[in-house]
Amino acid sequence: MKQYLQSHFILIFIVALVSALAAGCAGTKEKKLKTKGFTLTYQDKTSAGSSISKIQLEHPLKISEPEVRRHLKSLVFEEMSLFGKKKPVFLPQEIERIGRLLTKALQRVPHHKIIHYELETPRGATSGDVFASKKYIHWRFDSIKGMEFAGRSYTSLGNVNWRMVPQSGQRYQAVEKL
């Protein structure tokens, strides 16, 4: 009987220990940097959807700050409205604010994570993900200046939508948002 109680106690102890470890791991927060209306987080690539989870990431990335700034400057969008104009996704003062932080994030991101960013602007938030594969740096946008991506010209509420305008050497692909 004494041996039965000992083994029963050991079994309960092991189950409690495993449960505590699992709860501790599940509660681990993503690494987050927040400064002056700009937030960066490293997120597991599997949480970003099936289109990204299939991509072989090449992280951390060896890239200079001037290169990141050129990328940011080259990103252009167009509002899908009657008088929609091509506009930069990031204004020069925004690039000045976030260029160094994005560079450091790309240089330090773990190989199985992607970078999620959110920039608060007077016109609304610009948010999305950035990650690198073998040949490309991928910029994925959820919203630009407060306008969320809906995949069609007008949203059900009549809000104007947008599309990316690829520049020389760029291409874009619209992926359905989950």
Sequence positions of predicted segments:
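Bacterial signal peptide processing site
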Residues: 26-29
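C-terminal motif of bacterial Sec signal peptides marking the signal peptidase cleavage site
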Residues: 22-24
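Compositionally biased P/S/T/G-rich terminal and signal peptide-adjacent segments
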Residues: 55-73
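Post-signal peptide N-terminal segment of mature Sec-exported envelope proteins
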Residues: 31-60
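Mature extracellular/secreted ectodomains of secretory-pathway proteins
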Residues: 67-178
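Bacterial N-terminal signal peptides that target proteins for export
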Residues: 2-12
